């Protein structure tokens, strides 16, 4: 719609350029110059006067087009078929995650094939692999964002389809690469993890997530509003708010999807402390592109083209000299790259 708006805007701006040469030509070939001149002047004035009314009409038309696209997206969500709720729901008593020969496809495109692994409470299971390999899909299926075609996914020995959605969501906390924050206060954004939490509990979660100090430096502390008339937070600060939210929820299962993506030299240490506070005694599924962040995971699953190609600890996978070893070597090599300026080189 923006392209059409710009095109019509350009055409309207060009009307006087089109009228002038035509009017000049008509005046040169007119039998009566005096009789034709008022008509030419009228068209010149008309071409300028009609510009702004037509521009408003085109602008409104473009907004209507934009609104119709937004309505279509909202309708797609509202009319999305809900997942079936179990008739006799069961509630897990522990947080072991089991994938048993899971196959899944987006419409007709198969993205996971015969995935099997077990993640026990108090352990970290890391998923690594190239973009599009299926890592995030595995994490999302753990929360039953979609139903699978074949196989079974269980939490505490209970298939996901037999767990009520509300109970399942209470079992899982998420920290994503891009963390949604709402146009509300910092305190309410953290309290999204536990709507009944007190102000003291919110502050304790913020301290554990290493974000209390930067929150107190904001104009109104925990009552500072985010965005829309308030402040804007950096990517690293948003992630630590999301970690505080997950700490406050205290769910037994934790899914981390590139949770340290925005960590830099200044806040990486704080981010690691926050994550250590978050993952204690939980079943953790962690997706990472930087292998240094998951080298201490209890098990690492190397996902490639929708399949688990390798499985083991960091040292075990290095000894296999397979995909993981190649990825580790590539990361180590890239960390030694230098930026050259003339005859000087600066090591990264």
Where are these regions (language model features)?
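Cytosolic ends of transmembrane helices, especially the final helix of ABC transmembrane type-1 domains
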Residues: 3-8, 49-77
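Residue-level signal for transmembrane alpha-helical positions in Major Facilitator Superfamily
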Residues: 12-19, 66, 198, 252, ...
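Short beta-strand segments of immunoglobulin-like
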Residues: 87-89
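ABC-type nucleotide-binding domain
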Residues: 92-348
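Conserved catalytic core of two-component sensor histidine kinases
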Residues: 44, 51, 169
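Alpha-helical transmembrane segments of polytopic integral membrane proteins
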Residues: 17-24, 54, 67, 71, ...
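A hydrophobic transmembrane-helix motif
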Residues: 1-44
